[in-house]
Amino acid sequence: MSDYEEAFNDGNENFEDFDVEHFSDEETYEEKPQFKDGETTDANGKTIVTGGNGPEDFQQHEQIRRKTLKEKAIPKDQRATTPYMTKYERARILGTRALQISMNAPVFVDLEGETDPLRIAMKELAEKKIPLVIRRYLPDGSFEDWSVEELIVDL
């Protein structure tokens, strides 16, 4: 008998029995009271008046109109974020552009014998010829769009 066979002995296994299904009794569930005009009656006949966030309040929240994408966009003259490209944006831009170049996207700089897509993307970034837009989200849900040409890049 080898060590391999001993691992599969007839001892108790440490797992649950997955064949047994558990169903809860339907009797344990109670019906929720129906609120009409913020009031209902309980089993004893007492009137319960709802306050706070009742069904009516949630209906009012559903009626609030959400802002569209155009309304969330901040115009160029009202931008609040820094015009400098962060290292995270730089990494994302270079990686995205290198992937595009590796998939035979047109290159906007002279190659000069360069074959590495990341080096070509770095050269495009240095000359600010990458045709991508960075979207910066703000805490209130609005966003600013910056083109790569507009951002100041520290190389």
Swiss-Prot record:
Residues 1-19 have a biased composition (Acidic residues). GO terms for cellular component: cytoplasm; nucleoplasm; nucleus; RNA polymerase I complex; RNA polymerase II, core complex; RNA polymerase III complex. PROSITE patterns: RNA_POL_K_14KD (PS01111). GO terms for molecular function: DNA binding; DNA-directed RNA polymerase activity. SMART domains: RNA_pol_Rpb6 (SM01409). Its main location: cytoplasm. Signal peptide: none annotated. It is found in: Cytoplasm; Nucleus. GO terms for biological process: nucleolar large rRNA transcription by RNA polymerase I; ribosome biogenesis; RNA-templated transcription; termination of RNA polymerase I transcription; termination of RNA polymerase III transcription; transcription by RNA polymerase I; transcription by RNA polymerase II; transcription by RNA polymerase III. This is DNA-directed RNA polymerases I, II, and III subunit RPABC2. It comes from Saccharomyces cerevisiae (strain ATCC 204508 / S288c).
